[in-house]
């Protein structure tokens, strides 16, 4: 039978090493307005359909958070009926959390964005602002603008002369891009819509040893706010052949990264055993969506590497075993390294990826649901300014240390 948990006891649980999940069942707009940091949004109407995907082990402690105690308790009862044996409800609901004086934060995909701002302070990642980039483009000096967003975002609007390379593809394709004669000695600028994916993309290229890399401060929003214009309707990234030399460079860089960061590999047979255990396990396919649809490990989530910062609505148990999968090692290692830096404690990479899985005699599933990237919907200049100020403020606590 579900039991209540007091707000301060939930704080203790969330700070512990015990695998658990905190599921906020309020409407998403309420979650965006105020939330418990690292909780996972799952509106009550989606509970039956998605709870087992979010919480892969039904024996884990799981706390349901509604606006009120009645909402929380009802959701915990529903979770128990779905087979979750340790469902709890937050006493007095989200309002009780607030009345206890405990912190909340607003926004969507906050943990990933918080990580990006922390990275910017602690590494740091060199930036370039919109006016500096515009001047560099007009100077005639070689500059490459790599847009790390999804193809759909790029096609809606992009920086003039930008090239769409979704973030997870950057390590694979950068060697080919730099090999073009016109790109000799070029400055490489990585952009997104705002800040996070620009920072992470530039950081990963830096770690590969790529020179003259910059993150575009505030992305396309900052570009517009600086009075610049965006192109519309240009073709985004499409599948294409990457040279063996570029793939080899990515694999070499990934292996060095794994050694430096302590990223561990797992063999296909061991992953198959892990999936059959009682431990919470997420298999995360970090390839591009068309690759996932063509064939993936049963039960795998699709999180293309560039969208990793925004995957918090799929990984509800932060202390679970996470295994990244690609078509070899490179993309899996780059993704696993970021997840480790974000604070996920148990991340490994399927050694050899999908080819190794099938070579070991294991089958693939085909098809599935491609999850579209859902941005924050910021459209007005006032909204852009407010959003960027909010995002920058996430890093203030790290700068003060």
What are these regions (language model features)?
Residues 1-21, 25-144, 148-282, 286-401:
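Rhodanese-like catalytic fold shared by cysteine-dependent sulfurtransferases
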């Amino acid at each position: 039978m579900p039991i209540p948990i007091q707000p301060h006891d939930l704080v203790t649980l969330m700070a512990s090493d015990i695998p658990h999940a905190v599921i906020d069942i309020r409407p998403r707009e309420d979650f965006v307005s105020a939330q418990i940091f690292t909780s996972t949004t799952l509106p009550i109407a989606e509970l039956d359909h998605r709870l087992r995907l979010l919480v892969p082990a039904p024996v884990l402690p799981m706390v349901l958070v509604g606006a009120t105690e009645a909402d929380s308790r009802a959701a915990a009862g529903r979770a128990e009926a779905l087979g979750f044996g340790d469902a709890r409800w937050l006493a007095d609901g989200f309002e009780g959390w607030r009345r206890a004086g405990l912190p909340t934060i607003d926004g969507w995909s906050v943990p990933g964005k918080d990580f990006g701002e922390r990275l910017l302070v602690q590494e740091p990642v060199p930036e370039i602002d919109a006016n500096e980039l515009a001047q560099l483009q007009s100077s005639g000096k070689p500059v490459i603008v790599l847009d790390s967003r999804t193809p759909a975002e790029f096609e809606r609007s992009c920086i003039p002369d930008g090239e769409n390379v979704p973030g997870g593809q950057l390590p694979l394709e950068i060697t080919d891009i730099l090999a073009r004669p016109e790109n000799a000695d070029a400055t490489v600028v990585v952009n997104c819509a705002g800040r996070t994916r620009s920072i992470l993309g530039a950081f990963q290229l830096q770690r590969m040893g790529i020179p003259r890399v910059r993150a575009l401060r505030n992305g396309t929003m900052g570009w517009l706010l600086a009075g610049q214009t965006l192109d519309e309707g240009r073709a985004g990234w499409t599948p294409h052949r990457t040279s063996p030399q570029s793939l080899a460079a990515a694999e070499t860089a990934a292996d060095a990264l794994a050694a430096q960061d302590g990223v561990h590999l797992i063999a296909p047979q061991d992953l198959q055993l892990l999936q059959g255990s009682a431990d919470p396990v997420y298999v995360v396919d970090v390839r591009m969506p068309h690759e996932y649809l063509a064939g993936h490990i049963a039960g795998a989530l699709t999180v293309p590497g560039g969208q990793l910062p925004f995957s918090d609505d799929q990984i509800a148990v932060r202390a679970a075993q996470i295994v990244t999968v690609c078509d070899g090692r490179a993309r899996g290692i780059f993704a696993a390294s970021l997840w480790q830096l974000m604070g996920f404690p148990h991340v490994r990479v399927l050694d050899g990826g999908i080819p190794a899985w099938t070579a070991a005699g294991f089958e693939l599933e085909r098809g599935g649901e491609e999850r579209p990237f859902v941005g924050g919907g910021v459209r007005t200049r006032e909204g852009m300014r407010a959003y960027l100020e909010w995002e920058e403020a996430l890093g203030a606590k790290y700068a003060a240390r």
